[in-house]
Swiss-Prot record:
Entry keyword Zinc: yes
Record keywords: ATP-binding, Cytoplasm, Fatty acid biosynthesis, Fatty acid metabolism, Lipid biosynthesis, Lipid metabolism, Metal-binding, Nucleotide-binding, Transferase, Zinc, Zinc-finger
Keyword hit for Repeat: no
SUPFAM superfamilies: ClpP/crotonase
Organism annotation: Yersinia pestis (strain Pestoides F)
Swiss-Prot/TrEMBL catalytic activity: N(6)-carboxybiotinyl-L-lysyl-[protein] + acetyl-CoA = N(6)-biotinyl-L-lysyl-[protein] + malonyl-CoA
Subunit organization: Acetyl-CoA carboxylase is a heterohexamer composed of biotin carboxyl carrier protein (AccB), biotin carboxylase (AccC) and two subunits each of ACCase subunit alpha (AccA) and ACCase subunit beta (AccD).
Zinc finger (C4-type): 29-51
EC number: 2.1.3.15
Domain CoA carboxyltransferase N-terminal, first and last residues per copy: 25-294
Function: Component of the acetyl coenzyme A carboxylase (ACC) complex. Biotin carboxylase (BC) catalyzes the carboxylation of biotin on its carrier protein (BCCP) and then the CO(2) group is transferred by the transcarboxylase to acetyl-CoA to form malonyl-CoA.
Any Pfam family the entry gives: Carboxyl_trans
Protein name (database record): Acetyl-coenzyme A carboxylase carboxyl transferase subunit beta
UniProt lineage: Bacteria, Pseudomonadati, Pseudomonadota, Gammaproteobacteria, Enterobacterales
């Protein structure tokens, strides 16, 4: 066998081995670049076990992480977006909706459920950032209001996980109207003395940060989450100055008093259960095992 044949044979073996590995088995951490086993990362709640980077998480995964198994009942699932304005930019709005629905399996960018958290009845909502950047539109506002109404009916707390780029431009004024609509609904929660906990994840921007995301009785953020109205690049171009390191990150915001707590995802469920038991004057709930209880600790770091 000639030297060229030996090289070609090695190349064929390598290609055969690569072809045998299905796509999506491995992924790379956006922060440290570590190659991670996808199944292990999912067990770790999308938190890198090497550097503790909190990756983006789907809305349903967040709600399943929070609520007791078997207690989840979805709210407003029948609501679907409509292209009332027949809006078109580089692509028709209805085509963007169809593509987002196909990619995510969701009808719109917010999922709401009622259930229990360690035995306590609660209502929870979560934004799906993969659906058009988690943008707030008519269905998002309607589902959030449905969640508030359910909390009022059940006389229980509401928890919302925000992850959004802001109002959806394709719905124009109707999307901006959701800021007032959701804020007015939350005012009813306040009148009734029912707790509303807002959890800000990466990113929480625009109209969502200017309305429901910052109206919590307690505002909690995940580590290094980008939180603000306009993005850092837009601000730099406007003021023509370099922004300080970590500007608009959760650590910067808690230093300035804009949020109340930073909580790591592995202990988020237990932290929320503890806070809600105090706010509702209920006994400390017994710990119910969940996915969060089996999460690996990052190297050289403890729960904070």
């Amino acid at each position: 066998m000639s030297w060229i044949e030996r090289i070609l044979n090695k190349s064929n073996i390598t290609q055969t081995r690569k072809a045998g590995i299905p796509e999506g088995v491995w992924t790379k951490c956006d922060s440290c670049g570590q190659v991670l086993y996808r199944a292990e990362l999912e067990r770790n709640l999308e938190v890198c076990p090497k550097c503790d980077h909190h990756m983006r998480m789907s809305a349903r995964a967040r709600l399943h992480m929070l609520l007791d198994a078997g207690s989840e009942v979805e709210l407003g699932s029948e609501l679907e977006p409509k292209d009332i304005l027949k809006f078109r930019d580089s692509k028709k709005y209805k085509d963007r909706i169809s593509a987002a629905q196909k990619d995510t399996g969701e009808k719109d960018a917010l999922v709401a459920m009622k259930g229990t958290l360690q035995g306590m009845p609660i209502v929870a909502a979560s934004f799906e950032f993969a659906f058009m950047g988690g943008s707030m539109a008519s269905v998002v506002g309607a589902r959030f209001v449905r969640a508030v109404e359910q909390a009022l009916e059940d006389n229980c707390p509401l928890v919302c996980f925000s992850s959004s780029g802001g109002a959806r431009m394709q719905e124009a004024l109707m999307s901006l109207m959701q800021m007032a609509k959701t804020s007015a609904a939350l005012a009813k929660m306040q009148e009734r003395g029912l707790p509303y906990i807002s959890v800000l994840t990466d990113p929480t921007m625009g109209g969502v940060s200017a309305s429901l995301a910052m109206l919590g009785d307690i505002n909690i953020a995940e580590p290094k989450a980008l939180i603000g109205f306009a993005g850092p690049r837009v601000i730099e171009q406007t003021v023509r100055e370099k922004l300080p390191p970590g500007f608009q990150r959760s650590e910067f915001l808690i230093e300035k008093g804009a949020i109340d707590m930073i909580v790591r995802r592995p202990v988020m469920r237990q932290t929320l259960a503890s806070i809600l038991s105090k706010l509702t004057h209920q006994p400390q709930p017994s710990v119910v095992e969940s996915k969060a209880d089996t999460v690996a600790q990052p190297e050289n770091q403890a729960d904070v």
